[in-house]
Amino acid sequence: MAPKNNRGKTKGDKKKKEEKVLPVIVDVIVNLPDETEAILKGISTDRIIDVRRLLSVNFDTCHVTNYSLSHEIRGSRLKDTVDVSALKPCVLTLTEEDYNEGTAVAHVRRLLDIVACTTCFGPSPEKSDSVKSAQVKGGGKNSKQSDTSPPPSPASKDTVVDEAGETSHSFPKLGSFYEFFSLAHLTPPLQYIRLATKRETEDIAKEDHLLSIDVKLCNGKLVHIEGCRKGFYSIGKQRIICHNLVDLLRQISRAFDNAYSDLLKAFSERNKFGNLPYGFRANTWLIPPTAAQSPAAFPPLPVEDERWGGDGGGQGRDGSYDLVPWSNEFAFIASMPCKTAEERQVRDRKVFLLHNLFVDVATFRAIKAVQKVMAEPVLAEEDSEVLYSETVRDLTVTVTRDTSNASSKVDTKIDGIQATGLDKKKLMERNLLKGLTADENTAAHDVATLGTISLKYCGYIAVVKLEKESEELSPPSQIVDLLEQPEGGANALNINSLRFLLHKSSPEQNKKTPQQHDDELTSSREFVSKMLEESIAKLEGEEIDRDSIMRWELGACWIQHLQDQKNTEKDKKQTGEKSKNELKVEGLGKPLKSLNSSKKKTDVSSPKTPQTALSSQVDAVSSEADTAASLQSDAEKNAQENVLILKNLLSDAAFTRLKESDTGLHHKSLQELVDLAQNYYTEVAIPKLVADFGSLELSPVDGRTLTDFMHTRGLRMRSLGYVVKLSDKLSHVQSLCVHEMIVRALKHILQAVISAVATDTDKIAIKVAAALNMMLGIPENVAATPHNPWNVHPLIFRWLEKFLKKRYDYDLNAFSYKDLRKFAILRGLCHKVGIELIPRDFDMDSPAPFRKTDVVSLVPVHKTFYFKSMQQAACSSADGRQLLESSKTALDKGKLEDAVTYGTKALAKLVAVCGPYHRMTAGAYSLLAVVLYHTGDFNQATIYQQKALDINERELGLDHPDTMKSYGDLAVFYYRLQHTELALKYVKRALYLLHLTCGPSHPNTAATYINVAMMEEGLGNVHVALRYLHKALKCNQRLLGPDHIQTAASYHAIAIALSLMEAYHLSVQHEQTTLRILRAKLGPDDLRTQDAAAWLEYFESKAFEQQEAARNGTPKPDASIASKGHLSVSDLLDYINPSHNAKGKESVAAKRKNYILKLKEKSKQSNVSEHLVEIPREKQKEMSEEDTEETGSEEGKSSEENHETILAPVEEPPSPPVIEDATMDNSNPITSSDVSTEPQHPDGSEDGWQPVQRPRSAGSYGRRMKQRRASIGKVYTYQKKNVEADIDNPLFQNATQQNDKYYILKKRTASYSSYADHHSPGLTTQGTKFGRKIVKTLAYRVKSTQPSSGNAKTAGETSEEDGLKTDASSVEPPTLSSTVQSEAYHTKNSVVSLGKSPSYKEVALAPPGSIAKYQVWVPQAEVSDKQEDDEMEKKTEQGTSMELTRDEQMITGLEEEVKKEISADPESNITQGEEEIKVELQPSEGVLGGSHINENDESGGGIQVEEQVEVELINDGVTDMIHSTREQQVIDQLAADSEDLKAKLSISTTDSGDASRGLLPNKKLSASAAPFNPSSPPSIIRPTPIGMNIGPSWPVNMTLHHGPPPPYPSPPTTPNLMQPMSFVYPPPYSQSVPTSTYPVTSGPFHPNQFPWQLNVSDFVPRTVWPGCHPVEFPPPHMITEPIAATVLEPTVILPTDIDTSGVEETKEGTQDVAVADEVMDSVNHVNNAVARSETENGNRKSEEGEKTFSILLRGRRNRKQTLRMPISLLNRPYDSQPFKLGYSRVIRDSEAPKSVA
């Protein structure tokens, strides 16, 4: 074998190199035998076993089982451990392998498994009307997704379902539990497959014949098939052999082919990314519907069907490992070297495999022993304590009867008194010392705990443990080395597969009448009542025992707390130093200061002796000092004795760890340690837990997660009552604790009932049903009384009241019965007792909700399996868990790169120890997915989360909290990938499970409500979304308080949603509440408070604008709600509950159509100068807020689909130099004071201040915002004279209506105005404005600046150049800068420099997201002229407002020319009439409205800047070809002008930086700073915040940060979806990341956008104007240096050889074209700039069609002409082909053209 190429490198070098390698997505191509290929999305860290897993969830290959993979270089039959990254190229070949009997049977089982979803999971929601209302709650499939012919208007139907479903606090429908997985509306491809007796056939050799099967197809045809080594062979007319059964049946039967194709299509529609609904196991307390139909037989799911080689998982089922020398094996592993991480990983792997094998074998032995006792009545009826015991090699199995008195509790803890044989005191000391000295090897070295299991089964308790530990260390039997982990750790032991069925299919049982069943229930109820009375009597005489045993985790948490506290004290450096001779007693902390002994107090007084010696009481002080010295000597003596005692009790290594912890605890005696630990428990541990609950750092959703959180902190469940007392302001925590106490109290009743009838198993079902009816039903003829305020059975209430008071010290009367969630109690009871029920909608309001047939079976309750196998978690990998914790911490601090690194290493360790598909690894997949999600790598995050979900569903259970969390997280990832309907399906599944577990009154549920609202708005169901938002707000108010920052976030979400509906008065009301809460909680200086203030000012400005529009008579589309003024939140329900008929899609479309027709008619009748109606500004705001990052579009999208472009938010550091972060920032300099960037969408922002509506609500108001214009970044420099030039010349009026070549330039003037101060709030007044007129269907705005005479710009003048940000959006443009209000612009004239920022007023008035963080400086020579400002405002307010409502492709704008007088002082930097403009263009693709410069060649005219025209392209079917042609010409002209301007002005950028450094910066708040969640909990858009049990001790916090963009383009966008845009903080600053809310998925939904890549042209619609041929555009050219996450803006970039093409154009052009020297200079500048950008970009795509561009030329007498030419010429020789030339003339309004022809 060839040597490794890294043998010369040191170990450290290897490590450093490995640390830098992060996982990336790779495409794995697998060549299939049918000469097709499957492209799999893998990750660079995958191995061949992962490729096999990907093939199993691929639609085309999921039926293929027996194969090998080969590589052209690595050879054939690659092992599962081969890394995919080592395969170059990553192309594999799938080779079919010969079958043996086992693999042939497994192949048949796979086919049965794939088709099981059509029959095993009950009715699908599409076909079942009875469960329509539960469809949403059950997360059932949307009919759009899974039905082959979706209904015409599913959105409206979903609206009805939603309004009646999730938001109505109704209890979940258990009958729809499995609908999420059901495809029963499809025809099953086959009816059955039966194993037949082997049939002899001549075509198959006897030794090759494996099996014979009979297959009945969907059409009723019975097919006989023989299985052989080469494949499957059909007998009959068609003798065909195929390697796999599916291909054979497809060739035999067209009906099967069609049905199977429909099934695969349904798989794809259900989830195109995978998560196929097969491979499930019956591992949930609700059994599959197919088993519920015949509970006596309990037909298994295919995976567990023993007839086809399936089983319940695990190893040792056949007894092959019973004789393993367990003691010797465990002892050997405990002695393995473990000093380094590599050694521990090897050791942990062996411990993990051995312990899992031991648990499996011990469980099987325990079940067999219990079954033996149940089968022998003599053993079962014995009165002895031990009913049965046996010894198998090293294992001892003991069976005892569970107690039949509910008040008695049997100790079944694997480390309890019964198991260890120690008394309570000794056990407490043992556990405390174990915790204090715990390290990463503790679990592996604790052989006694590893070698013990305990389970309860059918009323019996079985304990299996090692008989003795090996005294002599003999060599191991190598059993661990021979162990193989099948399927990468998947298919672990399903404890539910060991169920005991309670029903027998006897004829007598089936013949019972309903009356007989009622009699059985009555007698059983009496039996339970009698047992309850006895238990209550015994419980009343029980003494309260508060001192339970101490968990060893408490010691570990305590010492960690002491060390953290000591580190904090070191940082603060205590002011007073202790005496050298003082005995240190450290780490007690403030809560434990009272524990300091009198010795300690005396010691503390010793340092004061020198100070008091100066007094006259010298003798007294001397005696005191002597006493202190003697006491100190006694303390030192006692400490030395304590050290000796601890040394004897602990090993040398353990004592050394305790001593080196630097806490001083090694000086304490055992009793002192116990007392200190108890005080830490009461005064620190439990309050800290409650504090974590209150801050939502931890958010348990059920008893399982609550228990995990408490146990991993060493807290006993007996302390639940104390937790409730401390959680007086956390009603959801109190509810969870009370429910858990009730479940534990009722558990004892059920266990006692089962134990009492254990000898007669036929009665167990009816007795359990009767007990459940008493617990959860409403008794007949029993009314609530003061002694029984609950409407439950009196005995049940008495039991609960006594039990909770005795065991938990909690008064049940303090809890309201109406808050009782019976389904959560039922679920908890089934988990704790081991009951399996049929999935039926139980009527909890009836006296008898449960029948005998509802209770199907009993399953073992395993101490290691419950709470997600705590013991297995302990011996998985301590290093891996520590890395997970480090990843979580790095994520909290915003260090995304470190978080990814730690998470990747943690996953690698857990995969190496546990296997890639073990249940323990799923938590690491989920965490890493969350981290990658925050970096913006949504694709890779989705892959990891899908892995986690697949594992959790199959290994942990369909309702496990981790499974629930995976649903919510995956929904968020799908939403970010623009698959809204798919995301909605999964988030509703998560919501259904949340309702089942924690109910509607929980912060996680409130967060999920907002998630659903966001996705519903994405689908146009705005009213449903508002209902969810309202629910979320009320929930947060009730649970967290009206002044919680999470509640403020809810107010903000509603404010955003209302603003999208143009209900600005309501937005103002809600944002005022938001701001009030944030100011009180966070202070006015917090960024979140400032952002809320900016939002409020924006809303106020829009409300004012709306009032002005109403005063002017402009109709508002949202008058139905906005006109109502300030409504309370609850008043919204009148609007939120619309008439379903009126809000249907048909009526919406009709309204929109009528609205459009009216506008068209009005536009045609109007004159250009007369009918200029103001467009509702909020339309532009709404559409601009919908503009989010496009992640790609499907190739086949019609021209009606939106082509969205993104302008990245600007980030500027406080210092002048531009600093760009390639991984974290989307930044390009924008320096206009009026720049309007892409609006900062609240849901694409930092830390959860995200609006719920990303997409526009297309179906809500019946309008699609067809006419929108870009917000143009501009710098106004006005002269003092304001010239109003109206279009009075009839030639001009005609020119605007005919297809001529004249465009009118109007003049405007204005004066400078200074910026407001940063801290000036509420500056919402309208500034100076100027009117805009429509010129035909097209106009463009012009601003002038004066050039310096002679040279264009000198170094002295270019102190810092202003920037003009050109911006265009072909469909959904960015918002107009909010300084542009209604018909006028608020002019702010100030010199804007890179690295500076605008005023707070400027920012606050701008829509959030439209202004970036930069700074403003005002030269001293620039003095604001207030009079000029006022004059300008008066004049411009007389202008006519503008109506942008024309046809589908109307292009609007305004062209203005302002003449400036040249300053007389050539030395001044920047005069009042002059500004220098620097153009910084984002790389773009699409249509550009450009900016151009017109320089006077002889007469010295001013530079003329034409701002771009934003092209609005929304197609509704009608195309105006004439207008399109006209618009194309102007756009082409402006494109050329933009490049000219850019080339001319970008030259001075290098000189301008130094001049501005001496100016004082004035930092401003950016309204584009996405108002992020002010709270640590998720606010607006968060994944379902489910507590993740990676191990409950590793809660992972999810906060919002930015990272590098994903390397692959995203899938096509969902139509009408508004893409998110996120804000990036400057490099010197970072967002303060609060401790997050929920354990893994605590982050908000939209931390980051998925930026476009340079191949964006492959995903945008090809046709720019509807009805035209596709117009192609050149690839983007980066003018600025490339940024990783740059968002593309559509623009036409001039080609590199434009100068030569200009000459060619002159030769072929018209006589009017005159090329001036200035034009040639500008052309050369453009050439240089574009050439540089091409070099920087380095990635140009081939041009596929014709493009044209325009050049504005200026000749003699200032005649301006536009030269238009095809770009294709520029890349060919001069004589390649002829071309046509089109040009346009631009004239002033003072010039009357001679003709308009």
From Swiss-Prot:
One of its GO terms (cellular component) is nucleus. Disruption phenotype: Reduced proportion of the cellular volume devoted to chloroplasts leading to an abnormal chloroplasts distributions. Inhibited far-red block of seedlings greening associated with reduced levels of chlorophyll and chlorophyll a/b-binding proteins of photosystem II (e.g. Lhcb1.2). Lower levels of chlorophyll, especially in plants lacking REC1, REC2, REC3 and FMT/CLU. Residues 588-597 have a biased composition (Low complexity). Its main location: nucleus. Residues 604-620, 1224-1239, 1343-1352, 1375-1384 have a biased composition (Polar residues). Keywords: Cytoplasm, Nucleus, Repeat, TPR repeat. Residues 1184-1193 have a biased composition (Acidic residues). This is Protein REDUCED CHLOROPLAST COVERAGE 1. A motif (Nuclear localization signal) lies at residues 805-812. InterPro entries: CLU-central, CLU_dom, CLU_N, CLU_prot, GSKIP_dom_sf, TPR-like_helical_dom_sf, TPR_rpt. May act as the scaffold of a protein complex, which sequesters key factors that are required for the G2 to M transition in meristematic tissues. Together with REC2, REC3 and FMT/CLU, contributes to the establishment of the cellular volume devoted to the chloroplast compartment. Residues 124-164, 565-634, 1166-1273, 1341-1384, 1423-1442 are annotated as: Disordered. Residues 304-573 form the Clu domain. It is found in: Nucleus; Cytoplasm, Cytosol. Disulfide bonds: none annotated.
